[in-house]
Regions:
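Generic, well-ordered alpha-helical scaffold segments in large soluble proteins
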Residues: 25-28, 32, 71, 125
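Generic structural signal for well-ordered alpha-helices
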Residues: 22-27, 65
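Catalytic His-Asp segment of secreted/periplasmic serine-dependent ester chemistry enzymes
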Residues: 45-144
């Protein structure tokens, strides 16, 4: 599940209504598909122009990521921090200005190439997590 980029604001500090809606969504999915694994993907970086005309990460983004991470923990579902995968603070501008570009000039949305890049990073994270799980599990399966 990846929702929330458009609720982020420059001064956003309280995302309780968003979280309440997401909790309801996650709970409905758990009831409808009890065997399904659920992954919450955080919002990515989103830039805005300061009064001085400089591009900066919108202050509400990191706060929203924290809310999303807490939601995943509270609901016992997986979480992937796309903001950090993008490169964290200021990464949207880097993606826009990459050659070839990985994001749109609205400094909000990734493009197809950016999506493909991030999908690769998510895939690598999932494979790494599975490998770590298998290694830990091997210790429990050994006989003393």
């Amino acid at each position: 599940l990846q929702y929330g980029l458009n609720v982020a604001t420059e001064r956003g500090r309280n995302y309780d209504k968003y979280i309440a809606g997401m909790q309801t969504t996650v709970q409905h999915l758990k009831e409808a598909f009890p065997q399904a694994a659920i992954l919450i993907v955080s919002v990515g970086d989103r830039d805005y122009k300061t009064e001085e005309g400089e591009l900066r990460t919108m202050p509400g983004i990191k706060n929203l990521v924290r809310y999303q991470q807490n939601l995943a923990a509270d609901e016992a579902v997986a979480f992937w921090n796309m903001f950090e995968a993008m490169g964290g603070e200021g990464s949207m501008a880097d993606m826009v200005h990459a050659k070839p570009s990985l994001a749109n000039y609205d400094y909000t949305h990734i493009n197809f190439r950016g999506g493909k890049h991030l999908a690769g990073l998510l895939y690598e994270s999932l494979i790494y997590g599975k490998e770590q799980y298998d290694r830990r599990r091997a210790y429990y399966e050994e006989e003393p």
